[in-house]
């Protein structure tokens, strides 16, 4: 074979003859059909050396040494020098492409890696019969005489490595004379070429394995994999030859990657040995794939065995790619099996790898350090981490898998030392390194691209199923086996993928769209929470009453505490001290809000110390491999949501999509969906409603004349027409309670103001007149039925600038609330202990202060006496889990308070209400009252007083009415009275005297969230 790329590699004398002959022959024929006919012996490919070449080996060695970028350069050089037959690459490019893929894989460029692996597989499929042309020795395989290389253990499989020739000749046929005559090209005689067939087969297996790991379910029907599998299924090797074992391993790996583990397992098992119990070059990879099958089947203990056996086989073959993969699987399977401590194989291999395998050694040390820190041996873990060569961490490996594993071990060590700040910083680094290397994130991105591009390879049914699989909440075992990848996935912004899923699901059916939309909203909130909501989920689980948990959650909680007696003791002590402090606060009877804390200083010191210890435990558990579910917000199937609805209880939900606005009304036995035709006009009409309600300045006083003359009913009627004109539903009758799940701009709409019929002139009944109304951030939370707290502790009341007047008025307001509400006491807001820790003692919380917008985590929830005091929303979400079953924030503001002017809107309209709504429910409350705009004054105080009176009656034998009924009653009672302009900071007396406070400015800004179980 000869081509111009090879000419520098030919002997000069031979090259001159060949070139002269080529010129002579070409001159004798038209240029359109140039041919070169070489007699046997000219341009022998043997002059090019063995394939894969030594450059291939150099690239692999560079990878093992940590010089990843240099390895990629070498792999590309090797690829450029690979043989060609005409314009077609030869089989040595199979190995070269796979090596390029390995380099990109280590560098975290999964897209380029997949492209290289796919080329490798397509080349393998293009030469399906090449093994038949290999001139293998007729000698049967013999056992290798050298001792096993692994020092950390011995195989239990009763096998020995085989002594097989590395290099053999392959008979390559010459070019087809007829094809050369018709199409032009080079005509050569048959020739022999030295190759390393095991290396090529190993490259095929690696390419298939990586495709399976990187693409997962997305690659099961990929064309390159399918073509390679078809070629391997022909079993293109001599019968009864040991090359058949290579085919078994390769074909078994392909079947596994195609999602056919039952077909793969027997082939892989048979392909592990040749002859009389001899391992071969692909045995390690066969064991690795069997380990993957065992892990996928939940057989973690068996996977540990396969992985350990793979380390022995890989060491015997000096296969650095297999041995790194095998040891990574040892730890993964060990953790998935619930193993404790350092796996013996990892502990024993550290010294073995130190001299010749720098990257492997560093990765093993990082794994060992993680296990030691998890087990509580912080000193040994710190000593282990110091063994990692800093030069590696500053080079390519430090930006790759090694860097992620070392940073993760550093994080676990930080948490073991109760240094949460250091742990969080190291964990953030580990996640940042892991994110571009996450197969799940790559699969998700690729699926979105396929759908958006309109790929014919996927039907809507297939795409919807893949989205449901890839975007599903992590399974319990995901954290145990792959904590970093799982944390990287759940903390990433995947809204584009969820939006695409929703678009596909909408074409599939109503329930599919319901569930995709529910998952989208849930992820929008979770991805903005620390560690994708995992830290909060663990804190909620630890704080929960085991008697009120379902069986699965109770078992997870018991497992968390089973091996952590210190944590169990911390939780018990925390509850005991909190009980004493709650009793002390109640017994103090009206302590001054800014005076000394009721209760002993010793108890408050213990409480803060226990809270700090608990916080460190929660941080460590959330970063670790504990098998826990993220169960808030709940994610229920659409039929289950409807099943939980009571008779005459309905859910009205909305969802903004890329194409518009979808609405749905669901009852226990039916549902209706429709597209809002004038969706583009909704923001304009909501802004018009705000204007009609005199909302333009969040602090300005509104004249009674303006309120009396406002035309809010017309705006509300127009909104009602726009939202329901394309539906066949009516809200006029047959509804006891309506649960509204807004989205986007509709969070700013007080649905209570919508008219229930368009037949009457202004002044007809409103939605609130016909049914109880409450809101929920998600449809699942609308029926979540969170158990009510049996209230017996204090209810904290904080009064600040929400009322007009001097301190005496503030004191009077505080006194009215504490006297009018059972167990109400002023909420202390000290600097020490932290105010959020103090507030966690209370059973309920009402904050009557000017809070502004609380859409961000750093926004103030409860103002403090000093600049550093108070409680932020992130404080409230942080451990320890807060106790208040209800929280009232009438001093909150949203963008609606400024009339929805552009500068006031969050990046996604409505998030200034949606995010804090979920935050407050997640922190432990089952009921929350937010404000779209602040009113303040006597009316606000009376509304809160009347509402909380019902909520505070939640004793074991006297359950309160539903929150929506309590709120409706409070509005009816309070707004029937005339407002006093002297006690209303947002009201200015004009010529018009308001006979009552029924104008929606006074009450419609409040948004009641409730998901408490009705006993």
Walk through the language-model features, giving the residues of each.
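Functional beta-strand-loop-alpha-helix junction segments that form "active/interaction loops"
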Residues: 628-631, 635-637, 709-719, 804-879
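Residue register of alpha-helical TPR repeats
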Residues: 53, 95, 246, 285-287, ...
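Amphipathic alpha-helical protein-protein interaction segments
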Residues: 405, 420-428, 432-435, 439-449, ...
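Amphipathic alpha-helical segments of tetratricopeptide repeats
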Residues: 76-84, 119-123, 128-129, 229-236, ...
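Single-residue signature of alpha-solenoid repeat helices
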Residues: 71, 113, 222-224, 264, ...
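Catalytic cores of nucleophile-dependent amide-cleaving enzymes
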Residues: 777-787, 841-844, 848-949, 953
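An often Trp-containing, charged/polar helix-loop segment at the C-terminal end
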Residues: 944-1015
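Structural signature of alpha-solenoid helical repeat junctions
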Residues: 50, 90-92, 196, 243, ...
């Amino acid at each position: 074979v000869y081509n111009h790329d090879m000419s520098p590699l030919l002997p000069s004398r031979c090259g001159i003859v060949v070139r002269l002959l080529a010129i002579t022959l070409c001159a004798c024929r038209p240029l359109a059909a140039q041919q070169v006919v070489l007699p046997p012996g000219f341009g022998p490919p043997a002059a090019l050396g063995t394939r894969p070449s030594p450059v291939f080996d150099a690239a692999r060695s560079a990878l093992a040494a940590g010089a990843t970028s240099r390895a990629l350069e070498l792999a590309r050089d090797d690829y450029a020098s690979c043989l060609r037959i005409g314009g077609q690459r030869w089989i040595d490019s199979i190995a070269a492409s796979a090596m390029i893929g390995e380099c990109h894989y280590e560098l975290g460029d999964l897209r380029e890696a997949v492209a290289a692996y796919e080329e490798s597989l397509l080349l393998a499929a293009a030469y399906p019969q090449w093994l038949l042309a290999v001139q293998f020795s007729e000698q049967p395989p013999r056992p290798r005489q050298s001792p096993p290389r692994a020092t950390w253990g011995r195989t239990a499989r009763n096998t020995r490595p085989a002594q097989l020739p590395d290099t053999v000749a392959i008979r390559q046929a010459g070019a087809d004379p007829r094809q050369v005559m018709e199409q032009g090209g080079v005509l050569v005689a048959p020739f022999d070429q030295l190759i390393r067939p095991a290396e090529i087969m190993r490259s095929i297996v690696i390419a298939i394995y990586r495709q399976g790991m990187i693409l997962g379910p997305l690659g099961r029907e990929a064309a390159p994999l399918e073509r390679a599998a078809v070629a391997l299924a022909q079993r293109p090797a001599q019968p009864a030859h040991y090359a058949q074992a290579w085919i078994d391993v390769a074909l078994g790996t392909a079947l596994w990657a195609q999602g056919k583990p039952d077909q793969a397992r027997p082939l892989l098992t048979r392909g592990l040995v040749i002859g009389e119990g001899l391992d071969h070059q692909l045995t390690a990879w066969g064991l690795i794939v069997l380990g993957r099958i065992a892990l996928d089947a939940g057989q973690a203990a068996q996977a540990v065995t396969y992985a350990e056996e793979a380390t022995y086989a890989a060491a015997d073959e000096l296969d650095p790619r297999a041995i790194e993969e095998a040891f990574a699987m040892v730890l993964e399977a060990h953790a998935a099996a619930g193993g404790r401590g350092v796996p013996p194989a990892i502990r024993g291999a550290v010294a073995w790898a130190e001299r010749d395998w720098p990257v492997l050694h560093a990765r093993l040390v990082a794994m060992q350090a993680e296990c030691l820190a998890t087990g509580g041996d912080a000193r040994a873990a710190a000593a282990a981490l110091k063994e990692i060569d800093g030069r590696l961490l500053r080079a390519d490996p430090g930006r790759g898998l090694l860097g992620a594993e070392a940073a993760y071990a550093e994080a676990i060590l930080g948490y073991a030392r109760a240094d949460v700040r250091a742990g969080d910083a190291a964990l953030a680094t580990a996640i940042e390194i892991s994110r571009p290397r996450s197969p799940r994130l790559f699969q998700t991105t690729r699926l979105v691209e396929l759908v958006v591009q309109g790929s014919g390879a996927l039907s809507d049914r297939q795409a919807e199923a893949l989205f449901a699989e890839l975007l599903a909440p992590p399974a319990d075992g995901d954290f145990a086996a792959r904590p970093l990848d799982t944390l990287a996935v759940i903390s990433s912004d995947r809204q584009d993928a969820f939006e695409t899923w929703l678009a596909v699901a909408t074409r599939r059916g109503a329930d599919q769209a319901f569930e995709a939309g529910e998952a989208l909203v849930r992820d929008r909130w979770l991805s903005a929470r620390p560690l994708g909501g995992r830290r909060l989920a663990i804190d909620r689980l630890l704080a929960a009453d085991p008697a009120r948990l379902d069986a699965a959650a109770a078992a997870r909680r018991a497992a968390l505490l089973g091996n952590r007696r210190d944590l169990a003791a911390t939780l018990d002590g925390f509850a005991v001290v909190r009980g004493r402090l709650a009793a002390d606060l109640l017994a103090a009877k009206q302590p001054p809000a800014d005076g000394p804390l009721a209760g002993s200083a010793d108890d408050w010191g213990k409480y803060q110390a226990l809270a700090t210890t608990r916080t460190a435990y929660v941080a460590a558990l959330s970063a670790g491999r504990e098998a826990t579910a993220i169960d808030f917000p709940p994610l229920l199937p659409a039929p289950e949501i409807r099943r939980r609805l009571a008779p005459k209880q309905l859910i009205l939900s909305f969802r903004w999509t890329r194409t518009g606005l979808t609405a749905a009304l669901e009852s226990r036995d039916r549902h209706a969906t429709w597209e809002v035709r004038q969706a583009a006009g909704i923001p304009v009409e909501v802004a018009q409603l705000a204007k009609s309600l005199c909302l333009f300045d969040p602090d300005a006083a509104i004249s009674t004349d303006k309120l009396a003359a406002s035309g809010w009913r017309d705006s509300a009627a127009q909104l009602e027409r726009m939202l329901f004109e394309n539906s066949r539903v009516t809200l006029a009758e047959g509804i006891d309670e309506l649960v509204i799940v807004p989205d986007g701009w509709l969070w700013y709409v007080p649905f209570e103001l919508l008219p229930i019929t368009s037949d009457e002139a202004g002044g007809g009944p409103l939605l609130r007149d016909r049914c109880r109304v409450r809101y929920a951030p998600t449809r699942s939370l609308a029926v979540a039925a969170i158990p009510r707290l049996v209230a017996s502790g204090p209810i904290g009341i904080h009064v600040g600038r929400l009322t007009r007047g001097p301190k005496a008025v503030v004191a009077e307001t505080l006194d009215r609330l504490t006297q009018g509400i059972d167990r109400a006491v002023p909420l202390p807001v000290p600097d020490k202990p932290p105010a959020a820790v103090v507030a966690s003692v209370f059973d309920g919380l009402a904050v009557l202060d000017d809070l502004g917008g609380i859409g961000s985590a750093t926004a103030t929830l409860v103002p403090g006496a000093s600049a550093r005091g108070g409680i932020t929303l992130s404080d409230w979400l942080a451990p320890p889990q807060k106790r208040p079953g209800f929280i009232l924030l009438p001093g909150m503001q949203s963008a609606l308070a400024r009339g929805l002017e552009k500068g006031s809107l969050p990046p996604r309209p409505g998030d200034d209400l949606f995010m804090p709504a979920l935050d407050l429910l997640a922190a432990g409350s089952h009921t929350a009252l937010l404000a779209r705009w602040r009113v303040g004054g006597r009316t606000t105080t009376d509304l809160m007083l009347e509402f909380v009176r019902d909520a505070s009656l939640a004793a074991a034998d006297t359950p309160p009415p539903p929150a929506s009924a309590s709120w409706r009653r409070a509005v009816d009672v309070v707004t029937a009275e005339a407002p006093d302009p002297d006690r209303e900071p947002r009201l200015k007396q004009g010529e018009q005297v308001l006979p009552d406070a029924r104008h929606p400015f006074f009450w419609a800004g409040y948004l009641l969230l409730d998901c408490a179980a009705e006993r």
